[in-house]
């Protein structure tokens, strides 16, 4: 199990990035638009840099929903490889069987 503080910190980052996503996207669009004057683009860049660091989407870690493990997480299932194996061995995932050859 991961530390509760690490999981809570990640959840806080997720909420913050979701809340400021549209604002961040709008500012990025202004910064990347070559038709807008250099002065306005610079102001938008400063506003973008004044946003909280944790509001960036790449600061969010994909964590296992069961254990909180940060590595080896299947994106589609949001479960780590270890938790997936345990659930599969206990027969809790339909269609998943232990392989034998």
Swiss-Prot record:
Signal peptide coordinates: none
GO biological process, one term: translation
Keywords: Ribonucleoprotein, Ribosomal protein, RNA-binding, rRNA-binding
GO (cellular component) term, any one: cytoplasm
Keyword rRNA-binding: yes
GO molecular function, one term: structural constituent of ribosome
Disulfide bond residue pairs: none
NCBIfam families xref list: PRK08881.1 (NF006477)
Function: Binds 16S rRNA, required for the assembly of 30S particles and may also be responsible for determining the conformation of the 16S rRNA at the A site.
Subunit structure: Part of the 30S ribosomal subunit. Contacts proteins S3 and S10.
HAMAP family attached to this UniProt entry: Ribosomal_uS14_1 (MF_00537)
Protein family per UniProt: Belongs to the universal ribosomal protein uS14 family.
Protein name: Small ribosomal subunit protein uS14
Species of provenance: Pelagibacter ubique (strain HTCC1062)
